[in-house]
């Protein structure tokens, strides 16, 4: 899969005209080639798994850089380039893409490494060095992501030190944003780390630091939305009331801000945020329509919001889906969409976070939220959340339906909604789950759909639901479970479709008697159906009722005289039924149309062998070997017929002798 991905990526990289990206791709391809060569040579490399993970990481990093290069290359109106400038970013970000490229190893080191003493020493040196301004930005971002993946008290304290000591205000604000987000994420475990709580409280004793912390809160509010921030910080206040009391009330008092002024300020922020959101959305739609978005087309609406756009991707700089399951759960977007931890299980908070999508079916999300708020208090979250999540799933899986070859891509891990806490929280009614399951099924996400149908099938007691549930199980090879669902559907009413699916499942598990019964029921509905007649003939062959199968096949041959598949079946059944004349006649028909296969030649060899025409049998068997071009395949087809040949009057020692001659002739080639 990695080699295929690199081959697909190569022309996209060449389009950028960026020599650095081309060199990175060539390096990854060479390393992959060396790895494959060592593997094929039989060399046992204990670090093979680690090397593969590293190459996957480098590939995703390269994809993200190519994506950014395409956007920069094709935005001639300067809008996107201006958006990347730090003074246009709500959350302070790095100065420019070129500088980040030069300092990227620093970011990678801090992000992908566990915060141990050596890396924290490097972090402190970067923070303390005035010449390392860009590296300090990236080190804070990288350490934040590392802490989201793997909690470390020492790493947390190092971020607090950066928020306290750095002489540059933007870097201090960046550190404060990281500290506050980590406080929110790890709210439930802070009571076990009193040193962290004490350090933050001591830091907030300073008026200057409270101003920085308040600025960081504003950054988070502008990025995630007023409603989300209010809910999240209220949740944090439950366990850290002294800290929050130091932060907001004292800041408001020192700045002499009234509650009305604060409300006006929040409304102003929200208005600005919606404008930014709409601008980003239109830009992404334009890029997608011009086929310039090579990587994130499936997130056309969600990824266009400022929550996901370039200035705010400092915590998600690369597509993180290659990370292990536990690591993904620590990244904020995954926590929001999958774990819901940041929202403290508050549904309306999750709805507010999803509001960053922008517009759904032409209606702004803010209108949907207002509409949801007009409902009863207990249902306001569920109404809007269902609308948003249903559309999110439909858009995501519409991409897979239009690009089915990407269903094996690691991106599909993003859509494991049936296993997520969010899914269980939002879709409390069976009717809602039925909508999502139907969407997943029609997008060929059968395993996910089956998980949802399993939750609701017995509750709804619907023939349609049981049918869809059985079909999903059938598609993933769970035939016994599919039959259980179909039998429950049969209790509510029978149909031709149901019999057809049950016959398929019975045949797949080798229950040919029941499969034959289903064929009889199907033929009662459509007696002249050639498809059902052919299915019955196949079942009869499996039951070794060759004479009955041959009668049906002759009928089908009359109806469809030029059907090669039916001719092959007649040849075999006629041979087993000792009707050698008919078998030879149908073989000649195949030979005249040049449609014989290796099995046909084996069958003719059997006929000649039984008729004591050993040389003709030998030549027929050799023709079969030539067509198969593989002795093992030939023997795998020939040897199961030994009992049949003995039953037809050939001694077993003669069968072995013929087999030895064939093997010898193959060895002499």
Where are these regions (language model features)?
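Alpha-solenoid helical-repeat scaffolds
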Residues: 312-493, 497-504
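Conserved structural position within tetratricopeptide repeats
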Residues: 457-458, 487-491, 520-524, 554-558, ...
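TPR alpha-solenoid repeat register
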Residues: 432, 465-466, 498-499, 532, ...
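TPR/TPR-like (Sel1-like) alpha-helical repeat modules
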Residues: 180-205, 609-633, 643, 656-663
